[in-house]
Amino acid sequence: MNHSSNEKEPETIEPLRYLSKTEVATVETELLRDYRFGQQQLIEIWGHACAIAITKAFPLSSLSKKQPTLLVVCGPEQNGSIGLVCARHLRMFEYEPTIFYPKRSTLGLHQDFTVQCEKMDIPFLSYLPTEVQLLNDAYNLVIDAILGPETDHKDVKEPYAGMLVTLKQVKIPIVSVDVPSGWDADEPAKDGINPEVLISLTAPKKCATGFSGKHFLAGRFLPYDIQKKYELNLPEFPGTECIIEL
């Protein structure tokens, strides 16, 4: 069968780009400085998208325990605040989050997120049980919002080093925000926690190359010029969704 010479060639789909730590920092600086996004605004966008991803991966009807309990473990910097926002939205979606936030940030914008959770009567744990079975029995899953891409994975201090030891042993699923805690953002981990779900923010990081679990991307807010400049090749999000499963 002859094909006409003006028949369109199939479009080449460029592969999704995985960013290095340095590129992540550069993109975020550009968003804040040149595009006038606020840091609190970005944290809210990301936290809300994380909550949506969790509802997709673990719908209320799929949870094994009678109560839809979740444990959100928050670190001291931006990832921790994203965890706080995620917990607040999950509460609105009728889950029952509990937060463990051992070193609260002194920055006003992070404190705002803490107050919002407290005002919604989301409980805060005073300590993380080291007896893993207590966590397995009490919660359906753990949300790891401890350490972000900027963290030096070789220099994780207490209490976070001890928390990672505990989380490595839990039997319930772990959902990691952006970068699984304890991983180097630039390369897949040889040792570290093993999340069942990863939610990449803005664009996936190099460490997520070959990630075998369920992988979501929350990045449907990036100005097109930034997407083009960094050749991110983001996938087409379905409908009006703010997340996509990769």
Curated annotation (Swiss-Prot):
The gene is yjefn3. One of its GO terms (biological process) is lipid transport. It comes from Danio rerio. It comes from the Eukaryota. One of its GO terms (cellular component) is mitochondrion. Residues 24-234 form the YjeF N-terminal domain. Disruption phenotype: Morpholino knockdowns have a reduced number of nascent hematopoietic stem cells in the ventral dorsal aorta between 28 and 60 hours post-fertilization (hpf). Morpholino knockdowns show increased levels of free (unesterified) cholesterol. One of its GO terms (molecular function) is NAD(P)HX epimerase activity. Accelerates cholesterol efflux from endothelial cells to high-density lipoprotein (HDL) and thereby regulates angiogenesis. Orchestrates hematopoietic stem and progenitor cell emergence from the hemogenic endothelium, a type of specialized endothelium manifesting hematopoietic potential. YJEFN3-mediated cholesterol efflux activates endothelial SREBF2, the master transcription factor for cholesterol biosynthesis, which in turn transactivates NOTCH and promotes hematopoietic stem and progenitor cell emergence. NCBIfam families: yjeF_nterm. Interacts with apoa1a. Binds to high-density lipoprotein. This is YjeF N-terminal domain-containing 3. InterPro entries: YjeF_N_dom, YjeF_N_dom_sf, YJEFN_prot_NAXE-like. Keywords: Lipid transport, Transport.
